[in-house]
């Protein structure tokens, strides 16, 4: 049986975290990128992590952050997986004693084709829409057909996903994991419980 894994990213409150977890999210993303409207600090992250039930993965998202600051956060917040969204290379990403996911901003098929070679130690790749100045969370999607024949390293689909289009996205790409942030929000940084539930329910229906 295939299960479509879901990650709800940009969680900013324990309430949003608990709702997503109870709705069936497999992972929750905490953004440690000060320029993001969904950024949180260590104190907030600790409160969110403490509220979660077992077996929900906590993912820390960084963008071109210093190794020193990443280690400080990892020492104070129970993080299971690191997700890198900046210009980090494999040597940088693999040094933190946590599995890591590397976001790839997709413009062409070669971005997808070359990603596994560039990040051989990644647990998974996350394919997101390219933007010249923003590192994810844009609400934009890329050409999903570029992934239709991809069979490399495990990967996650992101970029412009919503409860309305996640079914189509999975059917086109064959994704086994999906990541959403803005597509389930009431406003930036505040999740809409109904949208979160609908997104996860749709992903679950596609599991087989």
From Swiss-Prot:
Gene: trpF
Protein name: N-(5'-phosphoribosyl)anthranilate isomerase
InterPro entries: Aldolase_TIM (IPR013785), PRAI_dom (IPR001240), RibuloseP-bd_barrel (IPR011060), TrpF_fam (IPR044643)
Reactions mediated catalytically: N-(5-phospho-beta-D-ribosyl)anthranilate = 1-(2-carboxyphenylamino)-1-deoxy-D-ribulose 5-phosphate
Domain of life: Bacteria
Disulfide-bonded cysteines: none
UniProt KW keywords: Amino-acid biosynthesis, Aromatic amino acid biosynthesis, Isomerase, Tryptophan biosynthesis
CDD domains per UniProt: PRAI
Known pathway: Amino-acid biosynthesis; L-tryptophan biosynthesis; L-tryptophan from chorismate: step 3/5
One of the GO biological process terms: L-tryptophan biosynthetic process
Catalytic activity, EC: 5.3.1.24
Entry similarity comment: Belongs to the TrpF family.
Recorded GO MF terms: phosphoribosylanthranilate isomerase activity
Keyword Isomerase among UniProt keywords: yes
SUPFAM superfamilies per UniProt: Ribulose-phoshate binding barrel (SSF51366)
Keyword Transmembrane assigned: no
